[in-house]
């Protein structure tokens, strides 16, 4: 008898995982999603889903477009999502955000937050802010 273990990505926020289930990338609300189900996803629209923790977003390694507008986010680590082109973080709780690793970023919407500073000096492709 052999056991096959598949890589899983930890997603502790139930609202985040439920949104992934609703999109068909997961099927059980258990804090985990098969990494193979999400690592080639090109776009995520998670608008007004009451998400407050995006732990697990790093599993979406091929993500080009990400819309997280209207959630309860105050922190997100997008450093592993290196191919991101378009990001909408409007209407959250951000005071700061580090996008220095997202050098392919072309469009960023981040209005209606609590930003005190935003460093986009490394985002040389950024055309829309």
How would you describe each model-predicted region?
Residues 1-65, 80-82, 103, 122-124:
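N-terminal capping/linker segments that flank leucine-rich repeat
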Residues 41, 63, 73, 84, ...:
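Conserved hydrophobic position(s) of the canonical leucine-rich repeat
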Residues 41-46, 66-68, 85-89, 106-110, ...:
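Conserved hydrophobic beta-strand positions in leucine-rich repeat
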Residues 54-58, 73-79, 94-100, 115-121:
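The feature encodes a structural signal of leucine-rich repeats
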């Amino acid at each position: 008898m052999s056991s096959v273990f598949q890589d899983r990505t930890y997603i502790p926020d139930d609202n985040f995982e439920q949104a992934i289930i609703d999109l068909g990338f997961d099927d059980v609300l258990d804090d985990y999603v098969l990494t193979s189900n999400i690592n080639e996803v090109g776009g995520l629209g998670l608008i007004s889903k009451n998400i407050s923790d995006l732990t697990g977003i790093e599993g979406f390694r091929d993500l080009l477009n990400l819309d997280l507008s209207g959630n309860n986010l105050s922190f997100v680590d997008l450093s592993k999502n290196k191919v991101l082109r378009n990001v909408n973080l409007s209407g959250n709780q951000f005071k700061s955000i580090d996008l220095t690793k997202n050098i392919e970023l072309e469009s960023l919407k981040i209005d209606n937050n609590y930003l005190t500073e935003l460093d986009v000096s490394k985002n040389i492709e950024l055309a829309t802010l």
